[in-house]
Amino acid sequence: MYTTRASRHIDAPPSAVYQALVDPADIPRWRVPYGMTCQVHDFDAREGGTFRVSLHYDTADGTGKSGARTDTYHGRFAELLADERVVEVIEFETTDPLLQGAMTLTTTLVAMDGGTAVLVVHEGVPDAVPAADNEAGTRMALERLASLVEGRSAG
């Protein structure tokens, strides 16, 4: 198991970024790498609340962890600190023992330079998930998050 970190500055206040982290309608718009679509099955954004999300590959050559072209994960919100931090404990839905086990995803927001510094720390990632893929997917999601939230702040 390993840990990845990714960060990005977003030109919007922490409150706007936090809202996108906990709004189930926003999740499919940003929390997905390019080449995939996102489906939110359940999403109860409160401490102890649970969620279930699937990422579907757009092309036939995508190999999923939960199915032929799908990565499904579920989890719970371990901590929600408005405008500051979201801590999630997540697990892939898979029969592959090399992909099983709980991971912790911590997103920290800090007001900085008229916007928000966002740090995502993904701990306990199974070694069977290539670190470069995990890092790239997180960076793509942060790029989408920035586009979504900055677009709202500019409007």
Language-model-detected regions and their locations in the chain:
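Beta-strand/loop substructures that line and gate deep hydrophobic ligand-binding cavities in soluble
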Residues: 78-79, 87-139
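Hydrophobic pocket/interface hotspot
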Residues: 17-18, 27, 51, 77, ...
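Glycine-rich portal/gate segments that line the openings of hydrophobic small-molecule binding cavities
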Residues: 39-91
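Short, highly charged C-terminal tails/helix-capping segments
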Residues: 148-155
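Hydrophobic ligand-binding cavity/cleft-lining segments
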Residues: 1-38
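Short beta-strand segments enriched in hydrophobic/aromatic residues
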Residues: 10, 21, 55-57, 92, ...
